[in-house]
Amino acid sequence: MTSGEHNRVFGFTNEELKKTIGVRLNRELYLCYYIIYTIMMQFYQDSATYSYIEYVKIDDVIQAVDQGLAAVISQIEVLVLSEIEENSFKTLALMWEDLPMITTEESTIRRAARNSKIGYVKMVVNFMVNQRLLQEAEERYYPTMRFRALIENYYTEHQGRLYEILNGKEEN
């Protein structure tokens, strides 16, 4: 699972994005991509849906990632996936599953880190806030106009294979 060949997500190469978000390995970056996609799906179901929820919380995103990866893995036998896609989703699901919800150091403060589910989601939302895609207020994350424009263009131009897989649709 990647952003697509020759696609500089948010104007970054994969290496630049790894450095900016704070991850080292490709699988960590791909998990961040999946979390970004999940956040997008929280606000917009498709290009025809201009109504969106007002905000998301970190716990909402974690629950959506849990459900999304579980659904894909449970359907992996019926979905027409290439070997690379199948292995990518298995790797992401196993990596996510192995993460604790929160570490003992994070019990009072939610920190961006690679050692927990909350930490990963916090890294991603921090990145999205820094890119002016989300705005934070009292641990609620609201979409900005920039986010809305990016999402509306994404759906019309680059809906892509990930959308098909997550919605149980096969490529034509």
Regions found by a protein language model. Give the residues of each.
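Short, amphipathic alpha-helical interaction segments positioned at domain boundaries
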Residues: 100-110, 130, 149-172
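Eukaryotic partner-binding/assembly regions in large regulatory complexes
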Residues: 1-47
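Mixed-charge, low-complexity intrinsically disordered segments
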Residues: 78-107
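Positively charged, polyanion-binding regions of nucleic-acid-associated proteins
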Residues: 30-64, 80-81
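Minor-groove-contacting beta-hairpin "wing" of winged helix-turn-helix DNA-binding domains
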Residues: 1, 140-146
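DNA-recognition alpha helix
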Residues: 56-73, 92-100
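Short amphipathic alpha-helical interaction segments
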Residues: 113-129
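A short, conserved structural fragment
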Residues: 125-140
